[in-house]
């Protein structure tokens, strides 16, 4: 594996697609990139992806979900941007922390090398030392794959993104022309008179070209498909062929985007430009499972309450997506009802009472915990199907300890370090940990599943491997008390409790791990499928009756 620029040989055979964005952030670069990758994978190519995040954080682990959405956890324990979750779901691959490049990670590595004397007294600068490190990371992530898609976070013109765009300019200079493709995603808004305006796209491309990058493909994010006049203007003023201008209009479900851009011919154009068309599978032999999965008709509809503290979908994105996947598997429309755990007022309580099932997700801190416990009590006492994830698992233990075991004031030591009954306590290996970033119990761990339990029925195996992100666990001193009162810990990692359930309840299931991070279209997470299937078995959910 090459470790420095001078070791690199362009003949290694990788193809690189760089995806940049203009006009504004949050346009959907990641979904555009992931959809392109999905279509190339359908054509028989081994595709991977890299997300560049130009912030100074080393990783996303300490970021506020209000600002950046959920922290997505990889198999190797990397805490990363939620876009990597979309890549894993669309491409059906397991990525690594090396597939996320941040400014903090890059600068730290360069500074460590300088301190170690690796630069032999040279003046360490953005060019060439930082840009060389960026290029090295991209090439190492791409090794062994046919195609690597690299998304550059942020918007062209952002000052923090400049070193990355310069690295890309150098990258293109070092590679063969038919091994590199630049895709630029921009906003094409409507004017008040209904005309699609291309000026923002023109200015965005002008900014990109001033850095030395010329896009090969332009993708217009718009409410509706680009009309011919808009395409002609974009092609003329941005200096790209008409055939290289594609639409990416709004859709109700992101899983339809690959089908839409396939109709536009984006995948075929990409393969032709990269010289991949002759190696691609014939259209009649390409995988159609994706289309079959995401376009199937639904026969049922369910409402599931999500009881959390972050009132935005991106903060719990993988849970929303996992419910979609469970819906694909059961031919069910799954509606999510947001319930604010911090304000369990009459409106939210009514929403909870109308729900067919309840999910209490992961999280940190004291805010909203009593509301979550209240929701768990409601689910347990009223036989409402319930799924608790990470903190939701822990709060289910707290609720049971208080209301069934009679342990007044029982709580998690994270929330109340003076409780008389710390049924949830800090992991022993965390006692001496002081740093916050990257120090939790992270990544994939195996769980042994007890035969004859709901967990065994769901996973259909004696063991499962799921991803974790936590510092606290069930206190071993209270396990006997909890079990003697009827709570079953059906999954364990040695002496650590990983799964809980109540045998006499239709579906009361909690996991210390995050099963949502391994769910995929066509391969939905077992706990989510179990939740939806139980609702269908115990509730009248016919779509026509619900609509009526």
Curated annotation (Swiss-Prot):
Annotated positions binding CTP: 25, 158-160, 197-202, 233
Active site feature: 390 (nucleophile), 514, 516
Binding-site list for UTP: 25, 197-202, 233
Entry's Gene Ontology molecular function annotations: ATP binding; CTP synthase activity; glutaminase activity; identical protein binding; metal ion binding
Chain sites annotated for binding ATP: 26-31, 83
Residues that hold Mg(2+) according to the record: 83, 151
Family (UniProt): Belongs to the CTP synthase family.
Protein name (Swiss-Prot/TrEMBL): CTP synthase
């Amino acid at each position: 594996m090459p470790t420095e620029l001078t070791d690199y040989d362009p003949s290694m055979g990788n193809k690189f697609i760089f995806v940049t964005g203009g006009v504004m952030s949050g346009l959907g670069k990641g979904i555009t990139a992931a959809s392109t990758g999905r279509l190339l994978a359908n054509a028989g190519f081994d595709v991977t992806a890299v997300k560049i995040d130009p912030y100074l954080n080393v990783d996303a682990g300490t970021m506020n979900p209000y600002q950046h959405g959920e922290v997505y956890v990889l198999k190797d324990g990397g805490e990363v941007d939620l876009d990597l979750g979309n890549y894993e779901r669309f491409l059906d691959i397991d990525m690594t922390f090396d597939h996320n490049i941040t400014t903090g990670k890059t600068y730290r590595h360069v500074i460590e090398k300088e301190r170690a004397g690796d630069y032999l007294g040279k003046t360490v600068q953005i060019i060439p030392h930082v840009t060389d490190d960026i290029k090295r990371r991209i090439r190492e992530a791409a090794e062994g794959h046919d195609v690597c898609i690299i998304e550059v976070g942020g918007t062209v013109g952002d000052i923090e993104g400049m070193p990355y765009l310069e690295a890309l300019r150098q990258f293109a200079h070092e590679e063969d022309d038919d091994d590199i493709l630049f895709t630029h995603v921009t906003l094409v808004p409507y004017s008040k008179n209904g005309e699609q305006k291309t000026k923002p796209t023109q200015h965005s491309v002008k900014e990109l070209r001033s850095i030395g990058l010329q896009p090969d493909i332009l993708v217009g994010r718009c409410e509706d498909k680009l009309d011919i006049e808009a395409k002609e203007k974009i092609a003329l003023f941005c200096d790209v062929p008409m055939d290289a201008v594609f639409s990416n209009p709004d859709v109700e479900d992101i899983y339809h985007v690959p089908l839409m851009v396939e109709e536009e011919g984006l995948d075929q154009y990409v393969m032709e430009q990269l010289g991949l068309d002759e190696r691609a599978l014939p259209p009649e032999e390409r995988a159609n499972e994706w289309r079959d999965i995401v376009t199937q008709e639904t026969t049922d509809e369910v409402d599931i309450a999500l009881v959390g503290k972050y009132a935005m979908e991106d903060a719990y994105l993988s849970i929303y997506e996992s419910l979609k996947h469970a819906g694909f598997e059961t031919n069910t429309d799954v509606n999510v009802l947001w319930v604010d755990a911090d304000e369990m007022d009459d409106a939210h309580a009514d929403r909870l009472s109308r729900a067919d099932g309840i999910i209490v997700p992961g999280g940190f801190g004291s805010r909203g915990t009593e509301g979550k416990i209240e929701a768990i009590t409601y689910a347990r006492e009223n036989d409402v199907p319930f799924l608790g994830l990470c903190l939701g698992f822990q709060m289910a233990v707290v609720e049971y300890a208080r209301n069934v075991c009679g342990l007044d004031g029982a709580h998690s030591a994270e929330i109340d370090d003076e409780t008389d009954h710390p049924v949830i306590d800090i992991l022993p290996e965390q006692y001496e940990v002081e740093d916050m970033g990257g120090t939790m119990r992270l990544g994939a761990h195996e769980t042994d599943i007890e035969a004859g339990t709901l967990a065994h029925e769901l996973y259909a195996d004696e063991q499962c491997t799921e991803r974790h992100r936590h510092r606290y666990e069930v206190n071993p001193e209270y396990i006997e008390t909890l079990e003697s009162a009827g709570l079953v810990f059906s999954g364990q990692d040695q002496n650590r409790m990983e799964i809980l359930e109540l045998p006499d309840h239709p579906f009361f299931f909690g996991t210390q791990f995050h099963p949502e991070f391994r769910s995929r279209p066509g391969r939905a997470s077992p706990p989510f499928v179990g939740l939806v299937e139980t609702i269908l078995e115990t509730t009248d959910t016919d779509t026509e009756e619900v609509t009526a």
